[in-house]
Amino acid sequence: MSNVDSEESPQETTCEAVVLDFLAHGRSDDDRPQYQKDPLAYALGVEDFRLFECTVDGDATVAIGDRLVVDPPADRSPEVVSVRAVEHGDLSGGAQSELEYVVEDVVEAQEDRFVEFYLEAQPVTLRLHQLNLLPGIGDKLQEGILDERRRGRFESFEDVEERVAGLHDAKGVIVDRIMQELTEDDLKYRVFARGE
């Protein structure tokens, strides 16, 4: 767990995050009296799928699905007081159950970005291709995707599914891989979710 406040990036791009859960009375495992607890929001970064715990201004109202700017500190949404990066196990139960739905919404909203992955995926090692990192994609499907992308660009997930025999849920495969990267700490390769 690191403080996002202390990280400075050379290029000041804003990091937008979708709220997964809002705890108006803070964490339940916090033993302080209720009036001393700060409201918290758990959020998922839209670009790099980082998980955040945001301390929220006591007067602000935040709902699940709201979008907040969490980084850099100068550009933060007014309701966000502080932000820290967290791991999947640190999320509240509500945030954990909401996570897959939000990931699916992000993938759907940025379909071009993820279809581009099918077009741009490269070998990781001599024996392993980025496409093989996706759940359910073995050598046969990998070859099918590579053959079809040589013939022409994929326009959408539907186009990928129509042209590649055996690949029935192009979006679901991406969502499953992102969920693996968010929930499993011991993955050697990360394609979508930035590791801390």
Which residues fall in each region the model found?
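Structure-specific DNA junction-binding interface
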Residues: 1-106
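Short, Lys/Arg-enriched anionic-surface-contact patches
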Residues: 106, 135-136
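A short alpha-helix capping/helix-coil boundary motif
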Residues: 107-111
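C-terminal extensions
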Residues: 112-133, 143-196
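Small-residue hinge/turn detector
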Residues: 138-141
